[in-house]
A protein has these predicted regions:
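Juxtamembrane/interface alpha-helical elements of multi-pass membrane proteins
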Residues: 2-79
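Membrane-interface, cytosolic juxtamembrane amphipathic helix immediately N-terminal to a transmembrane helix
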Residues: 27, 33, 113-158
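Amphipathic alpha-helices that form helix-helix packing interfaces
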Residues: 38, 42, 67, 74, ...
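Alpha-helix N-cap and coil->helix boundary residues
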Residues: 52, 83-86, 103, 122
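Hydrophobic alpha-helical transmembrane segments and immediately flanking/interface helices
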Residues: 70-94
Length: 168
């Protein structure tokens, strides 16, 4: 009976490991989607209203999550007169390490360099380019999620089943 319980626990643990890996990919995709939405909003605001950057970043104050605290920090730094490329360093670091999205961090790094140097039209054009890159990354992550998600679940189930049979 104890062997059966141990085998069942191993199988369940392996399934949960597969689900956790799939959940991580889903979270990365959600972060990319939120980031792309933020950059699209920046593009629209820069083109239509010419909204100052500190105000654009400050509008994100009510959003919650790992991504939005560095965005609020960027807004506060921009309001103090810190150059955009230095003000966005916390966001870039969060994307590189906290979210493990180095491609998104590279794209946002390019945007941060453009935000402080060019007029609103050029900044909006850069936002459009960055949105396209983020959308492409999101599509790649979706493909990875569908392919690897199934693979993670199948492999974890198989490994758990083999271990369970060995214990039986």
């Amino acid at each position: 009976m104890i062997r059966l319980l141990g085998a069942a626990l191993l199988l369940l643990g392996a399934l949960l490991a597969g689900q956790a890996l799939t959940g991580l990919l889903r979270r990365k995709r959600a972060v990319l989607r939120e980031l792309r939405g933020f950059v699209e909003m920046m593009q629209a605001e820069l083109l239509q209203r010419g909204t100052p950057l500190p105000e654009l970043f400050a509008r994100q104050a009510d959003r919650r999550g790992l991504l939005w605290e560095p965005v609020r920090d960027c807004g506060r730094a921009l309001a103090r007169g810190v150059p955009a490329d230095r003000a966005m360093e916390p966001l870039l670091e969060t994307l590189k390490t906290g979210e493990a999205l180095p491609e998104a961090a590279a794209a946002m790094g390019e945007l941060s360099r453009a935000l402080g140097k060019y007029d609103a039209g050029t900044q909006a054009e850069r936002c459009k380019q960055i949105c396209a890159r983020l959308e492409e990354q999101e599509k790649q992550l979706w493909t990875t999620l569908t392919e690897k998600g199934r693979l993670y679940r199948a492999l974890s189930f198989s490994a758990g089943a083999v271990l369970a049979l060995m214990l039986w």
